Amino acid sequence: MKIGRYIGIVVVCLLSAGIQAVNPSGTLPIVYMTTNSGQPITDKENYVPGTVYIDPLNTGYAALGTSTAPLTAQLKGRGNWTWSGFDKKPYKIKFDVKQTVLGMPMNKHWVLIASADDWLGYLRNPVGFMISEAIGLRWTPRLVPIELVLNGKYQGLYFLTEHVRVGKNRVNIREQTDLCTNADSITGGWMVEIDNYWTENNIEFDENNGQHVMVSLDVPKVLSSVQRTYIVNQIEALNNAIYGNSSAALEQILDIKEAAKYYLVQEIMEDCESYHGSCKLYKDRDSLGTVDKWKFGPVWDFGNAYDRHAERWIYDEPTWAQYWIGQLATWPVFQNAVKEQWWIYYHQHKDAIRQQAIDFANRLTEAAKRDAQVWDGTSNFRNNSNMADLRNDFINRYNWRINWLYQQWGEGIPPATEGVERTQTDEVGRKMLRDGQLIIQRGGKTYTIQGQILQSEY
């Protein structure tokens, strides 16, 4: 009786151990991350010392360190909802020495995105980044899918990603130091974020439509009184220009082309949280009498992309407040810039991005199955084990959105090479035609601002 009972206990223990012993799929690079003494990573504020090495397997990437000579680094948690709402945690890596990682340019700072909130085959962030890169925002974070082993335990599928920060190979503007008081230096090196989380140095104001807006500071973080006065005045001036009546004033403070590119990425991805949180803007230093303009970007979080699946603009009855963009979209100069970027994307990139998304999803298939084995049954678990179905679902949503935008904009407006010819200017700097209809003339064709052809010389 006792022998049989012991055998049963052993079998149960072995089965339980087998359930937990999920191994990497071997189809992606493996990141081995180990904390000193095996201590857990329990918060986002305090770094834990440790080591990292990367085995690329047969993926074509270069190795980084080895099991016997790993690289020293500082490790901590990161994220907001993705940190608090899921057992599968995202992480930040800060190498002691700058490293080139999986073909991405040298830097100390990297993040491991868990994508535990993505139920569309882990494709939201990767494809959002692909579109941003294709459209040509000045800098787009790069990422590589990997499998993570933390303190000897397999954690599943992650995305090793460039950390958004000011610096060479990232947002390449001149850095501004904390507590700076120099009048010239404080005009640039800013990166801020329209945020939905309160921080101590937040700038808060009421948008002209009554919505309360919080802007957090990425760089610099600790402000002198001179810096704070400058940045508060800049945010106020930007808000006033967006809600003002002068196109010239808007174009003087905001880079319209970059704003149009950023918006188009969000509209294609149908991201209804895109101007609510993780919406970044940056500004370089003024120089030689030239005032540098604020630029939207870089893109970051597409965690709610394609959630709504609605035939309306991302700022039209949004799930979350979409700050500034609803008003910005009323400006003809902005509409025109968006139509130009849409023309380029529609003719040059839409099909290539679709295929890139399919190929990327196929790379994740086996790792996604292993990830589901690890995290099934945990908090807010999203099951991405059936990548073929989820890939098809994502592509259908992408195609649907492209088709809906085509119904609104047509093929867009061909970009001008030497400015725009129009017939007259109204009292607020908007371009008008005889009866008040907005037009644009290019390449022998006359378009409405919606992209419809009025007449052609051909």
Identify the residue ranges that each predicted region occupies:
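Residue-level detector of functionally pivotal "anchor" positions at catalytic/ligand-binding pockets or at interdomain
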Residues: G410-R442, I453-L454
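Bacterial N-terminal signal peptides that target proteins for export
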Residues: M1-G8
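Short, glycine-anchored, charge-dense loop/turn motifs used at functional sites
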Residues: Y447-Q452
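Bacterial N-terminal signal peptides
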Residues: G8-A17
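Conserved NTP-binding catalytic cores of kinases and kinase-like/nucleotidyltransferase enzymes
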Residues: V22-V127
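Short, well-structured beta-strand/strand-turn elements
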Residues: A134-E147, D271
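Middle-to-C-terminal accessory/interaction subdomains
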Residues: L28-P29, Q39-I41, V48, L71, ...
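Internal "kinase-insert"/substrate-recognition segments embedded within catalytic cores
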Residues: K94-T100, N107-H109, A114-A116, G136-P141, ...
